[in-house]
């Protein structure tokens, strides 16, 4: 699962008098506690970091310097450190920018850092931690992980769902073809809309066996319902681990100071509006005996039985897990496809090389299929390079320590939230030559037998989560990403719009996606008979 995009600015400002009184109170408390017992300091030091205020820690500094991820990265550069300790409330947040230290956490000490933090947003989106990805370490997490490994991501199940994925890949090509085939010079299309629709619809198809919640569009594109649903899912991802003030000072939650809770609940209501009627109807069909064979993942979850022949999953577990599965694929594929095309338009020789690979491996008489994906090393390298240079979020999902530990010579207290910096790992000049240059060849040069694996096991950057909390669907996720990019590159010739002479590479300051959607000139490059009707 992908990390939320960023850590957002609050839109709610507390009264000035209350803020002033609070600041004065903090000064007094800090003065009184300045002479605390030095013997309480552990022999092994904490990682370097700012001096925290009593009770609130460094929350005031974070609040003043939003977005939080840029403040954290700036602070680490100021401290000249690859690991820091920032206390927010009573929680120690441990950001890491070095692959060596990252490996100490998630490889050498993986068992200790196998939990997740409790946040307002993740508790809401998981219906009280009934799911896998965001749930804290424990029996419920183990139960749901067993279900997904055995029933959703095993090779036979992934193959069983191939036809549904093919339908969505064909629909993507149909949608773009309908937009650009009428004119011999093609047409300008919004790449983000197409890629985002595919990213949402492919899991929707596998879970609910439907592309649309409503009627959709005649050209194959998303309708109002699909756009609303995807937007709500992206909102949930955005706020899942967004440094919400009340996650560190729970007694402030009633005030919703940064406005996160209102947005999360609104987004969750939208998701439920579209999904729950389908789930409820399907549950009733199984109970009434109208269904007895699975047709999609929703059916699979409903049909599972425990040792006593009773339903293995409750209705609420099914609803929560189907939501989390959609969250896992809705952001990363479209982010990779959009940034890859942006970079390749800036270096047209890369477009040519990708097209040549597709023509050599697939040809022009058929559309690229999942069976071709392992034989497309250059396109896989392009996707991997986007993961390095343009990550979907600034940090990975937080790992929480379930016991005190010593890592890289520092004391890491129980309950610490460890976050690996996707930005700084992927752009680290000590690891990557010309780190800000988009260069897919760097991954081909180190690949064994030209097999480019999108998973980065050495944590030189973060692609998929790893270790005990690692992504269960790495293979499927990699295939979805490469298929999206390959279908875009094989089906259409891409160029800058007629009135544009320069690519805009501006990165959103709050999110990490491209600040503005990619608009590009698309023109069919295959015989008309190949395109789905």
From Swiss-Prot:
Heme binds at residue 471. It catalyses: L-tryptophan + 2 reduced [NADPH--hemoprotein reductase] + 2 O2 = (E)-(indol-3-yl)acetaldehyde oxime + 2 oxidized [NADPH--hemoprotein reductase] + CO2 + 3 H2O + 2 H(+). It is an enzyme of class 1 (oxidoreductase). Its main location: membrane. GO terms for molecular function: heme binding; iron ion binding; tryptophan N-monooxygenase activity. Its EC number is 1.14.14.156. The chain crosses the membrane at residues 12-32. It is found in: Membrane. PROSITE patterns: CYTOCHROME_P450 (PS00086). Disulfide bonds: none annotated. InterPro entries: Cyt_P450, Cyt_P450_CS, Cyt_P450_E_grp-I, Cyt_P450_sf. PANTHER family: CYTOCHROME P450 77A4, CYTOCHROME P450 98A9. This is Tryptophan N-monooxygenase CYP79A68.
